[in-house]
Amino acid sequence: MGTVQAQAGGTEKAFIRNHTDAEVTWGPCPAFLPKGCELAVLHGDPAKKDADVLLKVPGGSVLAHHKHTSPERIVLLSGEMTVRYDGQQPVRLRPGTYAYGPAGLAHTATCFSKHSCVLFIAFIEPVDAIPVAH
């Protein structure tokens, strides 16, 4: 979709991306997540605070039980999935659904679509995914 010139006097430029854009560079997920899972950094440095990423999960895959040291703000962009946070009822996400996951709250998710599920995730703290025994 390209870059849009910022109106303010700063050096940072505004930009717009879609998960299908050629400018989006996908890389592998941590090894404990399903084969074919991919991550892409949209903005920021995932080793630092305030990074935005895309997560692509193959259809029919389960994200293993895990947690993050950061809260995560999620919007499902494509596909359908169920998220199960520990101690809470499972929630079904459809495209456009927003979900908030507190730091340290373990969860699992299932992409039950035929095609991949793609999520936008905003992290406050550095990006991580820590496996948790179920």
Residues covered by each model-derived region:
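Conserved short histidine dyad/triad with adjacent acidic residue
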Residues: 43, 49-68, 102-106
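Short, low-complexity, Pro/Ser/Thr/Gly-rich segments in the mature regions of secreted, periplasmic
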Residues: 127-133
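A short, N-terminal "cap"/entry segment at the start of jelly-roll beta-barrel domains
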Residues: 4-51, 134
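Ligand-binding loop in jelly-roll beta-barrel domains
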Residues: 103-127
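Glycine- and acidic-residue-biased ligand/ion/polar-headgroup-sensing regions
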Residues: 58-61, 68-87
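Short acidic-glycine-tyrosine-enriched beta hairpin
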Residues: 45-47, 87-104
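Conserved hydrophobic/aromatic beta-strand scaffold that supports enzyme active sites
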Residues: 39-41, 52-54, 73, 98-100, ...
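Extracellular/periplasmic catalytic domains that process cell-envelope and extracellular macromolecules
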Residues: 32-35, 46-48, 68, 75, ...
